[in-house]
């Protein structure tokens, strides 16, 4: 993605979207939307192309799988502590785990990669269904907050915050943060999100967990 001449990035309610254009595909445009799968570990992509020639070809691959056993990844991948992580990119000599070609033509296509019970990355066959299921789950989560102000940015930011609070839920407790500092801190302010967004059963579950551990 980083090699395209024009890159527009958008984030809203737990999903990313990129609009890409390049001199090598004059008049062509590629839009990629990525969101988490509704269950398990994985990602679902919707790839839409327009203005491409019949001879244009779109290929993909997943590579660079790394296993970190017994390590806390939210600390290892903390860019404030390890700024060199910002220079990471694609390395051509990395092993391709899975890959393929997409159908030629200006159509919307779907791709889903999930980790199976052994941690192996596999390509799912029912990609469109998986994508729509993941999208519906995000809409349900973020739809817990109804907001309508004159500021569209505030509206988008507020609804996105619901997904962030959901990301701090590590049953049976809320953790400090979704990525960095995602450690369980009793009484930390992330529990306020569970209260404000109506996850009262989660708040009660956390309370019971800590109260039961009191001596």
Map each language-model feature to its residues:
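Short amphipathic beta-strand starts and helix->beta connectors
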Residues: 26-30, 95, 174
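Extended, loop-rich substrate-binding clefts of extracytoplasmic carbohydrate-active enzymes
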Residues: 2-39, 159, 163
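Substrate-binding groove/exosite segments of carbohydrate-active enzymes
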Residues: 139-215
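An extended acidic
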Residues: 1-20, 100, 104, 127-146, ...
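Polysaccharide-binding surfaces and accessory modules of carbohydrate-active proteins
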Residues: 32-116, 135
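Secondary-structure transition/capping motifs at alpha-helix termini
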Residues: 24-27, 50-55, 197-202, 213-215
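Short glycine/proline/serine/threonine-rich loop/turn segments at secondary-structure transition edges
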Residues: 119-123
